[in-house]
Amino acid sequence: MTASHGTAPSPFKQPRAVWAVAFACVVSFMGIGLVDPILPALAGSLHATPSQVSLLFTSYLVVTAVAMLAVGWVSSRIGAKRTLIAGLVLIVIFAGLAGTSNSIGGIVGFRAGWGLGNALFIATSLAVIVASASGGFAGAIILYETALGLGIAVGPLLGGELGSISWRGPFFGVAVLMFIALVATIAFVPNLPKPEHKTSLAAPLKALRHRGLLTMGIMALLYNWGFFTMLGYAPYPMELNAHKLGLVFTGWGLLVAAFSVFFAPRLQARFGTAKVLYVNLFCLGIVMAVIAIGVNTPAAVIVAVIVSGAFIGINNTLTTQAVMLVSPVERPVASSAYGFVRFIGGGLAPFVAGKLADATNLSVPFYLGGVAFILAIVVLASGHKLVDAAEKGAVEGEPVCPSLQRVGATPAPGYQPVIVAVGAIENADEIVDAAALMARDAGRPLEVVHIRETAVVEELAIDAEDAEQARATVLSHLDRLFTLGIAATGQVLTSVGDHAAAGRVLAQHANDIDARAIAVGRSPRGQAAQFADGSFTTAVLHNAARTVVMVEPGKAPHRLSA
């Protein structure tokens, strides 16, 4: 939440505990793509029909969906590390057993156990990385997103290479890699404190009573119906071996990762969540129609699948953003409820597609998938006003659009302060104190604006700190400044995902109160992350009719230019 100029601290200088979990994240995110290249080989070797093989997705995703309802209850009682380890143990056991199986029914059953482990793992991995990372919240999120992108992109490639040796290869590969991650997690990840309050088992289902969350959840269900129809059945009409299928889905995965991390936030910031989703879902419907029409033309299917990666990457990010926008409940509960509905759609789609393909022909499931994408537009339209209201801040619950909350005494009108914007970073005190000296020299009071960040990654949303912690941080700054004889006031600026939007809100606030100047520190996020979801400082520079300066401990403040 600070300036982009200069060199940011590297998010990759982390303790061994973080690398252990990040490695496991890469392998976990490989999960779906790893299996795709071996689907035709699996069907041939075990004399199974495509509809029978599709149950690998159904058992995995349906169990993951149901387990998402309970992961909050489990982790709030046994702690994040134990939940993480339990998930890893289950993945190792059931991935290994799937590799030893000689029947499609056995693999389907073992994939269900794998899905349970995956739910326990993905629900806690981000929290463990954030809790264990050095260099602050931003570095932890960058590392997690890197693991996400790497896993999605590399999974199909590894699956294709191992699958070209034997269809058992990807299963044994996951088991071995996750066992390494399990040992490293046990050895290096410290015990983390349990949450202060326990999550109710019924909380995610109760959350679905809220119209906004249920509406966005149904939209996600329909989207995942189309997505997993394509993922489960597109390999067959391509008529490629495991190695070449791996290359195709690697190209797809690279686009998913790139558009999810780098392009989706920028499109959202420019056009709004709902508008981008409308266009994106429509494009996915067209892609599915192309696959259905060209189901007997392998080249057409290959190109359509690779291109779909761009739209899927955007949708994966913005669908979660839409859920968080309209959700009036705590974000972990909203994530669990959303994950449940989302994965149910993904799990049922391959099963239904298989039955349709057996009864008709292979093009029909793809037509149905296209219809699901179009129906998702209709459902989104029914909740459009809720999304718009949330983006404007006119909803109850946790704030999603950037918003300022006063901490401490309200200043008198016309106080024209120097504003310092700073997040929950290691040298926050030094940045505030440097800005305080600048304010004192200018004969103006200081206003401390503390940035409270929430990151949204896939179906997960995690806060750098809760509201009380952010408030306590501001009060700590104010108390310290009081002892130094510097007049100061405080605010908390809540930011969810979109850093540039937070910068625009701060700029408008500075204009409204006729602030003398705005001081920022050096960004801990780096250039790539700032390109992805917008630079806070750049947004301030472009929107504030004020002087913007960078302050660094031990250095003279210097003015920034747009």
Residues covered by each model-derived region:
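Helix-to-loop junctions at the C-terminal end of transmembrane segments
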Residues: M68-G79, F259-T273, A357
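Conserved MFS/SLC helix-loop-helix module at the cytosolic interface between two early adjacent transmembrane helices
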Residues: V66-N102
